Amino acid sequence: MAIRIKSTRVGRFVSESVGLGHPDKICDQIADSILDQCLLQSKTSHVACEVFASKNLILIGGEISTSGYVDVVQTAWRILRNLGYNETDFSFLSCINNQSLEINQAVLKNNEINAGDQGITVGYAVNETKQLMPLGVLLAHSFLKQAEKLTKQFDFLKNDMKSQVVLNYSLNQVECEEVLLSIQHTNAISLTELRKVIENNVILPVLNQYGFQDKKPTCLVNPGGSFVLGGPMADTGLTGRKIIVDTYGPYAHHGGGSFSGKDPSKVDRTGAYFARFIAKHIVSLGWASECEVSISWVFSKPNPQSITVKCFNTNIQYDEVLINRVVNNYFNWSITKIIDKLKLLDFVKYSDYAVYGHFGNDLSPWEQPTELDKLECLIKNFH
């Protein structure tokens, strides 16, 4: 059964997500936990942490300048123990350096935070869900969140897992055509029984939650067969390799920079959060039903180089040129102001965002459109 939806999309869109125990996400969680520990001790910490996991080895590297002290290995073990690993499973190598003095001097000038690098960041919003996120992205995450709950109920389920969802859009309605789940398990359950458990306890409940109740999609559970060996033992992991999972799936562009392990002076993270903040304002105001915001940055400069808004012909009340004028006039914020406004050094525990996406959680400061009245007033003056 297709459900009604506010959307002008036509055709198939495929979204994916990965779980807590996926090797790339293990690395992201470790990197963000190290970042959290640094910022907890000193808000002026500069962190660019990378993690590599393969077989029984975990390598933690990068540049960290902080007045505090963080035991990166013990921080990593807190993540790994939560996933069921013990001290005999991994050895560690650590190669942490201070941030380059040249970069540090360029980033901090006159108590102002400047862009830690050049780059392009992208934000997106669409009114097809109440979170103003693409439906397929939310579905892909929801299947794995539900499966994660089951790992606490059934010992035969493990944390390395992936999802993939095929949605077919047409004429303001959407059908879920196919759901693919690959979930690590033990030898204590047969593949046939595993498929029944996942279909009945994960796929169908989530589909019902989203209104897909009458027509069951094609369900593929572990289509490759058994999946006993998982995590870094089966597949090498690296920070920053799931940037599309972290954002908007196939629905929007991406600037290319990853988020995990990076403090707010890094525009890859802060710029992407800011772009989402702007896009959500535009859709919340009804200026467009779909919006993509691209922001470019110049190394050592405090303000955006450019902000470009695309509405994909979904803007009715105001011309896209006018929307761009208003956005560039109002949101030409410095990085210091962005960090303050989005509470990036006060509110955020970054490891909470290392899995299941950085956008769509209404509690996140960048998800709260606080400037609606000011923008509405400004566009009327420009109009």
From Swiss-Prot:
Location(s) in or outside the cell: Cytoplasm
The organism's place on the tree of life at top rank: Bacteria
Any one Pfam family match given in the protein's UniProt record, by short name: S-AdoMet_synt_M
InterPro entries: ADOMET_SYNTHASE_CS, S-AdoMet_synt_C, S-AdoMet_synt_central, S-AdoMet_synt_N, S-AdoMet_synthetase, S-AdoMet_synthetase_sfam
UniProtKB keywords: ATP-binding, Cytoplasm, Magnesium, Metal-binding, Nucleotide-binding, One-carbon metabolism, Potassium, Transferase
GO cellular component: cytosol
Enzyme Commission no: 2.5.1.6
Gene Ontology terms for molecular function: ATP binding; magnesium ion binding; methionine adenosyltransferase activity
Ligand binding (L-methionine): E63, Q99, D235, K266
Manner of cofactor binding, per the entry note: Binds 2 divalent ions per subunit. Binds 1 potassium ion per subunit.
Location of the region described as Flexible loop in the Swiss-Prot/TrEMBL record: 99-109
Coarse class of the protein's main subcellular location: cytoplasm
Alphabetical GO biological process terms: one-carbon metabolic process; S-adenosylmethionine biosynthetic process
Cofactor: Mg(2+); K(+)
Binding site for Mg(2+): D24
Biological pathway: Amino-acid biosynthesis; S-adenosyl-L-methionine biosynthesis; S-adenosyl-L-methionine from L-methionine: step 1/1
Reactions it catalyzes: L-methionine + ATP + H2O = S-adenosyl-L-methionine + phosphate + diphosphate
Binding site for ATP: H22, D160, M161, K162, D235, R241, K242, S258, K262
Binding site for K(+): E50
Family per record: Belongs to the AdoMet synthase family.
NCBIfam families membership: metK
Role of this protein: Catalyzes the formation of S-adenosylmethionine (AdoMet) from methionine and ATP. The overall synthetic reaction is composed of two sequential steps, AdoMet formation and the subsequent tripolyphosphate hydrolysis which occurs prior to release of AdoMet from the enzyme.
Protein name from the UniProt record: S-adenosylmethionine synthase
Biological source species: Mycoplasma genitalium (strain ATCC 33530 / DSM 19775 / NCTC 10195 / G37) (Mycoplasmoides genitalium)
Lineage of producing organism: Bacteria, Bacillati, Mycoplasmatota, Mycoplasmoidales, Mycoplasmoidaceae
